[in-house]
Amino acid sequence: MNDKNTLKGTTTVGITCKDGVVFATERRASMGNLIAHKATDKIFKIDEHIAATIAGSVADAQSLMKYLKAEAALYRMRNSEKISIEAAAALAANILHSSRFYPFIVQTLLGGVDENGAKIYSLDPSGGMIPDKFVSTGSGSPVAYGVLEDRYSDELYVDEAVDVAIRAIKSAMERDTYSGNGILVATVTEEEGFRMLSEEEIQKRIENLN
């Protein structure tokens, strides 16, 4: 199986909140019309205060995530402090841009919380870096954006935004054939740092939405 062809059909969502950020994805990896994997991890912990999502090639995405994790850890050791969200996003953008002639086939959302507050950046394969209050990537993003546009507010807190993110991913899964097989949700707050929600917690929230 050629990993370059997997994970093309994906839906990811990122939301900035007053007290942190929320990331959500579905779990299906596709290869053309074939469902290649049904339990794909698409949210990664880069550091205690930074998370990222992936859409694109499995091999490229995993390589980029490992690179960013290593650089964040190295920065912490060298400087005795955490890398800022903007600096981590700029690092990812530089990695992507330097490889633009043999690009990473990946679109990444990277965000977290630092002394400057909660931030999320969208990064494309050529190294473009755009800050967003809310953003979605992948084949299901047009559907997800409909939910985000309707329900996003600058006054959202993480607990509320989790429900918005789940609703956006759930809607995309219902309309996009390349998205499905469950939902992953992670939050990053100043108090708790990175936290991945359990399947039970996500399922309970889905039931409450219904």
Curated annotation (Swiss-Prot):
Name the InterPro entries on file.
Answer: Ntn_hydrolases_N, Pept_T1A_Psome_bsu_arc, Pept_T1A_subB, Proteasome_bsu_CS, Proteasome_sua/b, Proteasome_suB-type
Question: Per the record, what are the reactions this protein catalyses?
Answer: Cleavage of peptide bonds with very broad specificity
Which top EC class is given?
hydrolase
Known EC number(s)? 3.4.25.1
Question: Does the record's keyword annotation contain Ion transport?
Answer: no
Which Gene3D superfamilies does the record cross-reference, listed alphabetically?
A: Glutamine Phosphoribosylpyrophosphate, subunit 1, domain 1
**Sorted alphabetically, which Pfam families does this protein's record hold?**
Proteasome
**Activity regulation details:** The formation of the proteasomal ATPase PAN-20S proteasome complex, via the docking of the C-termini of PAN into the intersubunit pockets in the alpha-rings, triggers opening of the gate for substrate entry. Interconversion between the open-gate and close-gate conformations leads to a dynamic regulation of the 20S proteasome proteolysis activity.
Question: Where in the sequence is the active site?
Answer: 10
Q: Which GO terms describe its biological process?
A: proteasomal protein catabolic process
CDD domains named among the record's database cross-references: proteasome_beta_archeal (cd03764)
What keywords tag this UniProt record?
Autocatalytic cleavage, Cytoplasm, Hydrolase, Protease, Proteasome, Threonine protease, Zymogen
Localization annotation? Cytoplasm
One Gene Ontology cellular component annotation held by this UniProt entry = cytoplasm
Instruction: Name the principal localization, coarsely classed.
Output: cytoplasm
NCBIfam families registered for this protein in UniProt: arc_protsome_B
The record's family statement is: Belongs to the peptidase T1B family.
**PANTHER family referenced in this protein's UniProt entry, alphabetically:** ATP-DEPENDENT PROTEASE SUBUNIT HSLV (PTHR32194:SF0), METALLOPROTEASE TLDD (PTHR32194)
Subunit comment: The 20S proteasome core is composed of 14 alpha and 14 beta subunits that assemble into four stacked heptameric rings, resulting in a barrel-shaped structure. The two inner rings, each composed of seven catalytic beta subunits, are sandwiched by two outer rings, each composed of seven alpha subunits. The catalytic chamber with the active sites is on the inside of the barrel. Has a gated structure, the ends of the cylinder being occluded by the N-termini of the alpha-subunits. Is capped at one or both ends by the proteasome regulatory ATPase, PAN.
What name is this protein filed under?
A: Proteasome subunit beta
User: In the UniProt record, what gene is named as encoding this protein?
Assistant: psmB
